[in-house]
A protein has these predicted regions:
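Extreme N-terminal leader/targeting segments of oxidoreductases
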Residues: 1-25, 40-44
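Glycine-rich Rossmann-fold phosphate-binding loop(s) that bind the pyrophosphate
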Residues: 30-31
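Glycine-rich FAD pyrophosphate-binding loop
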Residues: 42-62
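Conserved N-terminal glycine-rich FAD pyrophosphate-binding loop of Rossmann-like flavoproteins
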Residues: 55-75
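Predominantly flavin-linked oxidoreductase catalytic cores and closely associated redox partners
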Residues: 130-288, 292
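FAD/FMN-dependent oxidoreductases across multiple families
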Residues: 265-350
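C-terminal helical "tail/cap" subdomain of flavin- and related membrane-associated enzymes
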Residues: 348-386
Length: 386
């Protein structure tokens, strides 16, 4: 175990490991997948550098709900005990067409029977700090501008991405640029993944994609023991409109309220998510006391690539993880757990590669993804087309 003290590097200085140093792994992006990957690699003793363009804590658009699957990963990283300000909840309450169904989380041999609601503002800072405490060198406020490629390394069969040996990075506070080099590079820069696209990743447009919008509201239901999902939203005339809504209590006087819809709905291109949010707020159960007057600021949103719809995910020296690989669950829109898990799966393959297995170990990452999600995601993609 690497017991080095946390090191949040100053991006205006040379690499703390020395000029010309080559790290074992460079991770681009400090969200769930990147920080998870950094933690597991650093915990195993590898020399890891992580660059994150924002400075933690920072806002991040998300539903903020952690399922038992996420909690398991946080517990394995030793983080659950730090969730002191998070709201613990017991399950999901579903509303649809006048019916209500309470679904408590079941007892399970691998996962707890509870989840948490916590803002990504707080959560991502905790996980990133944990990676640093494990020994990862974290460069905050540092943007990866472009990959550094090695044209002398041939692209092996089955590797869809070129050989990447680092990144040109910029200190966003000064504008200074430099290179960070590594034997392997992990792309973990989220759903938009500019770094991944620069290497050649793209979304399979035949696969489903989601759109979502969320905002924070004050509510007397802020400490409810269930998160809520609303599977029918109606407009001002009472007609059902495409999309779904959620209300996730944060336990601190606030609730996270959002709407989403899938590209598999033939009407989705004509939907304005702002109008959809207004409709949902107007039709939400009255006990939540939601209205424009209780909003705590403007809603924010984004697009959600799902079901491993982004590729290639494998290069001669590169792996793509989390939202950058489109790992969001098509069934429920959950992304955090799959970010943690794919970061961990990538760390396992990279550890094997660094131990001598090289590219053969990287190929096992794809096999691990298939074992973990392949059949489930294929069923999910088929289901949401119905």
């Amino acid at each position: 175990v690497n017991s080095a003290a946390p090191y949040f590097a100053d991006p205006t200085t040379a690499d703390p490991a020395g000029e010309g140093h080559v790290h074992d792994v460079l991770i681009v992006g400090g969200g769930p997948s990147g920080s998870s990957c950094a933690y597991w690699l650093a915990e195993a003793g590898w020399d890891v550098a992580l660059v994150e363009k924002k400075v933690f804590p920072r806002e991040k658009t998300c539903g903020d709900g952690l399922t038992p699957r996420s909690v398991r990963q946080l517990a394995d990283m030793g983080i659950e005990d730090s969730l002191t300000g998070a709201h613990r909840y017991a399950g999901l309450r579903c509303h649809a067409f006048g019916k209500e169904l309470n679904l408590p989380w079941p007892d399970h041999p691998s996962f707890p029977n509870y989840g948490y609601v916590i803002t990504r503002h707080d959560l991502d800072a905790l996980v990133n700090e944990r990676a640093a405490k494990a020994g990862a060198t974290v460069f905050q406020g540092t943007e990866a501008l472009q990959p550094v490629l090695d044209p002398t390394v041939a692209t092996p069969a089955g590797a869809g991405l070129p050989s990447c040996v680092g990144a040109v990075v910029k200190d966003k506070s000064t504008g200074a640029t430099r290179e960070i080099r590594a034997r392997y590079v992990v792309v973990a820069d989220g759903a938009n993944s500019r770094f991944g696209r620069a290497l050649g990743t793209s979304r399979d447009r035949s696969q489903p994609m989601g759109m979502a919008l969320r905002g924070y509201y004050t509510s007397p239901g802020h400490d409810q023991p269930f998160i809520e999902s609303h599977l029918d939203i109606r407009d001002s005339e009472g007609s059902v409109v495409p999309g779904y809504g959620w209300i996730f209590p944060l336990g601190d006087g606030r609730v996270n309220v959002g709407v989403g819809l899938l590209s598999t709905d033939r009407r989705w291109k004509g939907v304005n998510t702002g109008t959809l949010m207004e409709d949902f707020i107007a039709w939400a159960p009255k006990e939540w006391e939601l209205s424009p007057a209780t909003a705590l600021g403007p809603a924010t949103g984004g697009k959600l690539p799902m079901g491993l719809a982004v590729g290639p995910r494998l290069g001669a020296t590169t792996l793509v993880v989390g939202d950058a690989a489109g790992t969001i669950n098509p069934f429920n829109g959950e992304g955090i757990a799959y970010g943690y898990e794919t970061g961990r799966l990538a760390a396992a393959s990279l550890g094997e590669a660094l131990s001598g297995d090289g590219y053969a170990a990287l190929q096992r990452y794809e096999a691990r993804l298939e074992d973990a999600y392949g059949l489930y995601y294929r069923v999910a993609r088929a289901f949401i087309r119905v």
